[in-house]
Amino acid sequence: MVGFKATDVPPTATVKFLGAGTAACIADLITFPLDTAKVRLQIQGESQGLARTAASAQYRGVLGTILTMVRTEGPRSLYNGLVAGLQRQMSFASVRIGLYDSVKQFYTKGSEHAGIGSRLLAGSTTGALAVAVAQPTDVVKVRFQAQARAGGGRRYQSTVEAYKTIAREEGIRGLWKGTSPNVARNAIVNCTELVTYDLIKDTLLKANLMTDDLPCHFTSAFGAGFCTTVIASPVDVVKTRYMNSALGQYHSAGHCALTMLRKEGPRAFYKGFMPSFLRLGSWNVVMFVTYEQLKRALMAAYESREAPF
């Protein structure tokens, strides 16, 4: 057995809720530069036509984007929006991941044998609910990641200022900008990510290919990350563009998608795919492995505290 030993008592809903948020924050700390590179690549060419985009591209590839940012803006630019990112994960992942098992059991009326339909429904529910709770933090995170320090003033100087400025200039609705594409994205992401992780893990365990420890969690998380990136990338690009757009630039998320298709072609929907995969794959591995270990560690601590002397 690698890592903490599984406890006899299943983790409580509170342990899952806190463990998911904490694990997601740890994963964000490690993979945030890849997420920032993804955002920069996704918004690149937004104001240009298809013909000019390739010729005038400032960022080329994951490594090229990171090196360009370090050279022109300094290493700290890779962590622009980290505070909002951690706020997002603590509120977002706690709901979409931490409540997944509870919602799944609700749909199956307490049965441990959940079908694919119940898993998909649970993933969609917690994904959409998480967006409703954490959308303002996502808007601020994307705005910070998108702004460049070089060649002009920054839109926001601090996280608190960003919340205040957006609310003042765009209204409270500005903090929930892009909710529709984000709900769609996270319903897709949550379904694909959690259900794929669930299914891969269950398959490996039932076939006795692996035991319920770190290698199994690593393999399941990596597979879930790849499947999620392939399916969710188009919606993710639209979400990023729309949330970062100036007031009135796009009438709706649908208008944003049509503008992208017309000006940049269908390949625009997979802009930033490699950093998305590197980020989501590595994020999934760190998050799920940490989450599984945190659940076991917290329950072991709880059991030792409750055990009689």
UniProtKB/Swiss-Prot annotation:
Expressed in a variety of organs, with predominant expression in the heart, lung and spleen. Residues 41-77, 146-173, 243-268 are mitochondrial matrix. The record marks K141, R185 as: Important for inhibition by GDP. It is found in: Mitochondrion inner membrane. Its main location: mitochondrion. GO terms for biological process: adaptive thermogenesis; C4-dicarboxylate transport; cellular response to amino acid starvation; cellular response to glucose stimulus; cellular response to hormone stimulus; cellular response to insulin stimulus; cellular response to lead ion; glutamine metabolic process. Residues 16-63, 278-285 are annotated as: Important for interaction with long-chain fatty acids. Pfam families: Mito_carr. The chain crosses the membrane at residues 17-40, 78-103, 120-145, 174-199, 218-242, 269-294. Keywords: Membrane, Mitochondrion, Mitochondrion inner membrane, Repeat, Transmembrane, Transmembrane helix, Transport. Solcar repeats lie at residues 11-106, 114-203, 212-297. Residues 1-16, 104-119, 200-217, 295-309 are mitochondrial intermembrane. Gene3D superfamilies: Mitochondrial carrier domain. GO terms for cellular component: mitochondrial inner membrane; mitochondrial membrane. It is a multi-pass membrane protein. One of its GO terms (molecular function) is phosphate ion uniporter activity. It catalyses: L-aspartate(out) + phosphate(in) + H(+)(in) = L-aspartate(in) + phosphate(out) + H(+)(out); oxaloacetate(out) + phosphate(in) + H(+)(in) = oxaloacetate(in) + phosphate(out) + H(+)(out); (S)-malate(out) + phosphate(in) + H(+)(in) = (S)-malate(in) + phosphate(out) + H(+)(out); malonate(out) + phosphate(in) + H(+)(in) = malonate(in) + phosphate(out) + H(+)(out). Signal peptide: none annotated. The GDP-binding domain is located within the hydrophilic cavity, with GDP phosphates likely forming salt bridges with the charged residues, Lys-141 and Arg-185. The long-chain fatty acid-binding domain consists of an hydrophobic groove between peripheral transmembrane helices 1 and 6 near the matrix side. Homotetramer. Adopts an asymmetrical dimer of dimers functional form. Interacts with MICU1 (when methylated); leading to decrease the calcium sensitivity of MICU1. Belongs to the mitochondrial carrier (TC 2.A.29) family. This is Dicarboxylate carrier UCP2. The lineage of its organism: Eukaryota, Metazoa, Chordata, Craniata, Vertebrata. The gene is Ucp2.
